[in-house]
Regions:
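Solvent-exposed loop/turn segments at secondary-structure junctions
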Residues: 86, 103-104, 143, 169-172
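Surface-exposed, charged secondary-structure patches
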Residues: 107-147, 199-208
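Bacterial N-terminal signal peptides that target proteins for export
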Residues: 1-7
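Short beta-strand edge/turn micro-motifs at domain boundaries
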Residues: 146-174
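Early exported N-terminus immediately downstream of N-terminal targeting peptides
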Residues: 26-109
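Surface-exposed, polar/charged faces of alpha-helical domains
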Residues: 28-31, 35, 46, 50-53, ...
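Low-complexity, intrinsically disordered terminal/linker segments enriched in charged
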Residues: 167-208
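N-terminal signal peptide c-region/cleavage motif recognized by signal peptidases
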Residues: 13-16, 21
Length: 208
């Protein structure tokens, strides 16, 4: 398993229609975030164990997608990806971007996620609070090397959600923000979302 998909994935979650805000209730211990990640991994692996062949039947595939998606806060990831341009968008624009952005990540990275859950051996090493977020450091052995993954999580409606992944020091949220900012500066937001819509349309027929 190579590391390329780790760098490009942000993660998968159900396309949300509104921007979810971090939970404002009681403080939760950082160690609970590790428990959440471990339980999430175990659930997906249990579903994968039901497969009798390498090719997943459609119903099982959708079940796995749902569980993988549930770990991530795509509205927040979308906000971070657009950076300052997020405030310039209407609520309808934001909803559109969330749906398209999440769909692209889901379609591009599903097979790599499945490979990871089948073969990956991740060790969650530590968790600590960083402002309103909780940062979990993990290590994944890949062939002869080991990569570090830093999960950034917060509470959304009393549930842990991942909103950024830092892979060997590279933040996926920051990478997307820089890339989209350059595109918007050159061609404008409307051309960006049109290009993303086309990309998603190309991806979906190959997956369904």
């Amino acid at each position: 398993m190579n590391t390329h998909w780790f760098i490009t994935l942000i993660a998968l979650c159900c396309p949300a229609m509104t921007l979810a805000a971090p939970n404002e209730t009681a403080v939760v211990a950082p160690v609970d975030a590790i428990s959440f990640l471990k339980q999430h991994d175990a659930k997906v692996q249990a579903i994968l164990a039901e497969a009798t062949a390498d090719t997943l039947p459609p119903a099982l595939r959708e079940n796995i997608k749902g569980h993988i998606n549930a770990a991530f806060d795509f509205p927040e990831l979308s906000r971070l990806a657009l950076g300052t341009h997020w405030q310039e968008r209407t609520p309808e624009d934001r909803d559109h971007f969330i749906q398209t952005f999440s769909g692209i990540i889901e379609e591009q990275n599903f097979d790599s996620f499945v490979q990871y859950y089948r073969e990956g051996k991740i060790t969650y090493e530590s968790a600590e609070r960083d402002g309103d977020a909780t940062v979990v450091v993990a290590k994944v052995p890949l062939q002869r090397e080991e990569i570090e993954i830093v999960y950034k999580l917060h509470q959304v409606q009393k549930a842990w959600r991942v909103y950024d992944l830092v892979i060997d020091g590279v933040s996926t949220a920051e990478g997307n923000r820089r890339r989209y900012a350059r595109y918007i500066e050159k061609k404008g937001y409307e051309k960006l979302i049109a290009q993303l819509d086309k990309q998603l349309a190309r991806l979906r027929p190959t997956r369904n």
